[in-house]
């Protein structure tokens, strides 16, 4: 399958980057409209990326296929691509480079049927840009912070398979060091130390920040640690649709009391199998 991935890669966008990573990892024949610099192993400025470049960035050993604008338009007209994916369709506030990318839309909607075009919206906002501007007439809308089934389909983040821990670590403490939002707990400057802290902890704290989905949820699970997700009860049905919410709600009861669940090991094994089978970028 040949896929045209329309995204400018100006700045990381977790949902878009999850989808892109998964396509490459699955061996799909991807053609990029822009050079995906920060996704490649050759990228040498990971420390300047949001989240210190951990987990999904700088991981791909991949040679991008970026054609000229003229070549891309010719291939669209000839229906060379089997699918067209728009990686970031939403607008956002000041402070970020412009990630919205709707390049070639006029050509795509002229030459491609609706079932071969997909619009990805990983915005923290529940406002649905793609639906509000009628993009649903030209393709499928996929959104991580979805509130209405009629306005699109729910889609969640994923973690690269390569990031799943390879061993079964011994636990040393109840809670991992990092507490989201508390800057004095952000003490890890490399991925290995960051992951190790989760791996030796029974629970890792996480909760809704900008939106319900967050790479941190998956980083915790990937290191055989159980998320302590205190506000999960408030999560709407169409957010975190693939996340094991009910099990985490059960373990929350014990984490809240600084207690280890009596079936912690069994639950942890189940959750690790769950992330491996359902929550990687390949899934």
Q: Which residue ranges define each predicted feature?
A:
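Glycine-rich, highly charged phosphate/nucleotide-binding loops
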Residues: 50-76
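Conserved alpha-helical elements of sugar-nucleotide-dependent glycosyltransferases
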Residues: 11-22, 100, 104, 213
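A short beta-strand-loop structural module common to alpha/beta enzyme folds
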Residues: 29-44
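A short, glycine/small-residue-rich beta-strand->loop->alpha-helix junction that serves as a flexible
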Residues: 6-16, 92-94
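Catalytic binding pocket for nucleotide-activated donors in carbohydrate/polymer assembly enzymes
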Residues: 5, 17, 24, 32-35, ...
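Short beta-alpha junction loops
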Residues: 9, 35-39, 89-90, 121-126, ...
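Extreme N-terminal starter segment of soluble prokaryotic enzymes
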Residues: 1-3
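Catalytic core of nucleotide-activated saccharide and alditol-phosphate transferases
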Residues: 80-186
């Amino acid at each position: 399958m040949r896929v045209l991935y329309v995204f400018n890669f100006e700045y990381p966008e977790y949902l878009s980057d999850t989808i892109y990573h998964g396509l490459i990892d699955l061996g799909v024949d991807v053609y990029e409209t822009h050079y995906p610099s920060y996704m490649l192993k050759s990228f040498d400025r990971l420390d300047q990326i949001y989240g210190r470049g951990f987990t999904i960035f700088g991981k791909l050993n991949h040679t991008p296929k970026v054609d000229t604008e003229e070549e891309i338009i010719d291939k669209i007209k000839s229906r060379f691509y089997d699918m067209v994916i728009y990686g970031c369709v939403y607008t956002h506030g000041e402070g970020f480079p412009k990630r919205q990318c709707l390049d070639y839309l006029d050509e795509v909607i002229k030459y491609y049927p609706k079932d071969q075009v997909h619009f990805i919206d990983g915005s923290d906002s529940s406002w649905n840009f793609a639906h509000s501007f009628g993009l649903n007439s030209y393709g499928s809308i996929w959104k991580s912070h979805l509130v209405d089934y009629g306005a699109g389909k729910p889609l969640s983040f994923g973690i690269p398979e390569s990031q799943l821990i390879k061993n079964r670590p011994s636990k040393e403490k109840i809670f991992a060091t990092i507490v989201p939002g508390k800057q004095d707990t952000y003490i890890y400057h490399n991925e290995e130390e960051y992951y190790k802290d989760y791996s030796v902890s029974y629970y890792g704290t996480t909760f809704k920040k900008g939106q319900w989905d967050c790479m941190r949820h998956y980083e915790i699970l990937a290191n055989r640690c159980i998320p302590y997700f205190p506000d999960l009860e408030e999560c709407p049905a169409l957010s975190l649709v693939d996340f094991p919410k009910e099990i985490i709600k059960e373990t929350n009861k014990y984490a809240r009391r600084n207690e280890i669940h009596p079936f912690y090991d069994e639950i942890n094994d189940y959750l690790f199998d769950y992330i491996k089978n359902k929550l990687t970028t390949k899934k």
